Amino acid sequence: TAVCTMGLMAGCGNSNVGNTNTQKNASSAEDGYKIGISQFAEHGSLDNCREGFLEGLKEEGIEEGKNLTVDYQNAQTDTGTASTIADSFVSAKEDLICAIATPCAQSAYNSAMNADIPVVYTAVSDPVAAKLANEDGSCVGNVTGSSDVLPVEEQLKMIRAMLPDAKKIGILYTTSETNSCSTVKEYPV
């Protein structure tokens, strides 16, 4: 994701980021890039995605507080809030939006598609089903990212090894999330 982001950041140009944003979790930099990070929930793996994204930028010389302003917002598992966050990033004319998890990625793409603001997503299990990528995996616009597709075959093998006498297994999923629905279809009935 960091390599893709670097390419997108190069296209963003270097903007003055005298940000008047009063968001308490936004840091500031004198000259550099403005990035909005939208995260769907507080969760260890999603937190790791955010931290890894920022670490990747830092390794490339783009560092929060030096030449990078970050406006981090958490949707608290609410898709309406994810949309509001994405709209606010577009209104603020962020240089790039990093969207963590499928609902945030879909909201960011929908909000930014006509605004010439690149979107980088992560923690999206099925970018094609989420309409963030074409069937062949190519970009659908100014959006790119990484997938965290689940290894269904390996999971089933592990379940069989741990519970060889199991006749049925239950799978919990969220019907309102595209990634969840597409993943559950991977399991044999």
Segments and roles (model prediction):
Residues 34-60, 71-80, 176-180:
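Extracytoplasmic "Venus flytrap"
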Residues 45, 49-56, 81-85, 93, ...:
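Stable alpha-helical elements in mature extracytoplasmic
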Residues 71, 75-134:
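Beta-alpha junction/loop-to-helix N-cap segments that form part of ligand/metal-binding clefts
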Residues 136-146:
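Rossmann-fold dehydrogenase core element
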